């Protein structure tokens, strides 16, 4: 039997709420979303205005499956108390991290800027850029060397002088989390026949593997029979904010 146009128009996929930003499409499966995408942005979306996000192209992606709860991954991301013992290579690129500090605002008396070390061009295995520096960046953004945007609960973006790395997080089970890391570069870099992003990819993979190891150790510790609760160090105020954000979600 032939169907009418009206009947076929009603046979589409179920509608979902979606927002396009920065070259990504974000989906919210809630029937009536209570939170808009930008409301969870930390800091505001404008922090990445000088990066040409919409035109960047994917050079490489890597999928990890971590044996930990998704909240443990975020707790690890939101502090650098673990950095000196876990990320020695990263601490050489960002001296502030040697002080167990994620940002200079945690301890202004440290007198160490939240920026890459002198002579460092980018987050790569040899500290040198693997692509042309984005011409739209300010001198301060180039000097800092890394600008972060956090989009709880599913993504953070690390913007560097020559590339952008975005990390997406998805819970699979109560103790398993999928993490997808993507390295994005300008079309000009991608069109260059000599372009080789491997040093940026290798460095990002190193950091994520180090984080995965401590996250999985933490998960196993939560299963220890004597465990009741943990304690936050003074440097972990962002973790406290995360706990309060999550508790707020659970109370609504």
Whereabouts are the PLM-identified features?
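Short Fe-S-cluster ligation motifs
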Residues: 1-27
């Amino acid at each position: 039997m032939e169907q009418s146009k009206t009947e076929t128009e009603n046979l589409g996929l179920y509608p979902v709420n979606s927002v396009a930003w920065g070259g990504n499409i974000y989906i919210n499966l809630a029937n009536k979303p209570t939170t808009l995408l930008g409301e969870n942005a930390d800091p505001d979306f404008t922090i990445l205005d000088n990066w040409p996000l919409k035109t960047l192209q994917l050079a490489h992606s890597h999928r990890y499956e971590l044996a930990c709860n998704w909240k443990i991954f975020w707790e690890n991301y939101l502090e650098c108390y673990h950095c000196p013992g876990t990320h020695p290579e990263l601490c050489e690129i960002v001296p502030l991290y040697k002080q167990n500090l994620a940002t200079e605002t945690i301890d202004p008396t440290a007198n160490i800027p939240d920026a890459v070390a002198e002579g460092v061009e980018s987050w790569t295995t040899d500290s040198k850029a693997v692509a042309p520096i984005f011409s739209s960046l300010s001198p301060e953004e180039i000097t800092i060397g890394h600008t972060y945007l956090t989009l709880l609960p599913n993504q953070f973006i690390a913007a560097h002088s020559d590339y952008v790395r975005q990390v997406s997080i998805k819970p699979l089970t109560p103790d398993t989390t999928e993490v997808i890391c993507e390295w994005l570069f300008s079309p000009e870099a991608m069109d260059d026949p000599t372009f080789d992003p491997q040093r940026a990819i290798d460095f990002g993979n190193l950091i994520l593997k180090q984080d995965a190891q401590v996250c999985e150790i933490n998960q196993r510790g939560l299963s220890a029979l004597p465990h009741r609760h943990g304690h936050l160090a003074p440097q972990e105020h962002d973790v406290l904010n995360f706990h309060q954000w999550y508790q707020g979600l659970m109370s609504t």
